[in-house]
């Protein structure tokens, strides 16, 4: 496996760049956010990479950080989601935003991405929702979780939901959710009813 690449940018295309390292120019497909962040032609860049080996091709994918690469790997593990669709999804937002959409079951947001229809969006949510730990995402660290939401998490866990499921339900609460524990619990339970 080629885990990372450091080299000089030779060219940047719509969905790829060519990085020269050790006298070899490597074609690396990447999400738009990575392409926008790599720098200018002629400058040195560093990318986290994933090599996908197929019968007819060796294809290298590059990412600006390990979180992007990890999410890409999860996405291509979903039935019906190939590297191109995964790159389109990664180009639509930050890994945190995408993971929150998946955990929150935001099928409409996912289906707006080119190449992803409603069925594929539903499959992504179904297969990945339980694998996303919202506590690891920026903006949802334990210090940022309110006491009310910690209590709600404890209640949901005591009702038999996993910590990940509880975090997903809390993340799916609307921004204007009532500040009472009872109302937030009712909304969280509705989340499970619609899942």
From Swiss-Prot:
Positions of region (Domain II): 65-142
Domain notes: Has three domains with a flexible linker between the domains II and III and assumes an 'L' shape. Domain III is highly mobile and contacts RuvB.
One CC-aspect GO term: Holliday junction helicase complex
NCBIfam families from the UniProt entry: ruvA
SUPFAM superfamilies for this protein: DNA helicase RuvA subunit, C-terminal domain (SSF46929), Nucleic acid-binding proteins (SSF50249), RuvA domain 2-like (SSF47781)
Single GO MF annotation: four-way junction helicase activity
Function description: The RuvA-RuvB-RuvC complex processes Holliday junction (HJ) DNA during genetic recombination and DNA repair, while the RuvA-RuvB complex plays an important role in the rescue of blocked DNA replication forks via replication fork reversal (RFR). RuvA specifically binds to HJ cruciform DNA, conferring on it an open structure. The RuvB hexamer acts as an ATP-dependent pump, pulling dsDNA into and through the RuvAB complex. HJ branch migration allows RuvC to scan DNA until it finds its consensus sequence, where it cleaves and resolves the cruciform DNA.
Entries under InterPro entries matching the protein: DNA_helicase_Holl-junc_RuvA_I, Hlx-hairpin-Hlx_DNA-bd_motif, NA-bd_OB-fold, RuvA, RuvA_2-like, RuvA_C, RuvA_C_sf
Matching SMART domains: HhH1
Native source species: Chloroflexus aurantiacus (strain ATCC 29366 / DSM 635 / J-10-fl)
Name of encoding gene: ruvA
Presence of the UniProt keyword DNA damage in the record: yes
UniProt-recorded name of the protein: Holliday junction branch migration complex subunit RuvA
Region: Domain I, residue numbers: 1-64
Region entry Flexible linker, spans: 143-151
Family from the record: Belongs to the RuvA family.
Compartments where found: Cytoplasm
Region of interest (Domain III), residue spans: 151-195
GO BP annotation list: DNA recombination; DNA repair; SOS response
């Amino acid at each position: 496996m080629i885990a990372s690449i450091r080299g000089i940018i030779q060219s940047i295309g719509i969905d790829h760049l060519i990085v020269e390292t050790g006298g070899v120019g490597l074609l690396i497909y990447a999400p738009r956010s990575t392409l926008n962040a790599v720098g200018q032609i002629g400058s040195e860049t560093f990318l986290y990479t994933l090599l996908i080996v197929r019968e007819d091709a060796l294809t290298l994918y590059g990412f600006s950080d390990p979180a992007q690469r990890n999410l890409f790997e999860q996405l291509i593990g979903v039935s019906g989601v190939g590297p191109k669709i995964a790159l389109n999804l990664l180009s639509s937002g930050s890994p945190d935003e995408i993971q929150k959409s998946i955990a929150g079951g935001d099928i409409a947001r996912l289906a707006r991405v080119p190449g992803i229809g409603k069925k594929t969006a539903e499959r992504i949510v179904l297969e990945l929702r339980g694998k996303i730990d919202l506590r690891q995402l920026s903006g949802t660290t334990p210090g940022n979780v309110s006491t009310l939401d910690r209590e709600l998490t404890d209640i949901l866990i005591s009702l038999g939901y996993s910590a990940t499921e509880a975090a997903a339900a809390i993340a799916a609460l609307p921004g204007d959710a009532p500040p009472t524990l009872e109302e937030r619990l009712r909304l969280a339970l509705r989340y499970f009813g619609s899942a």
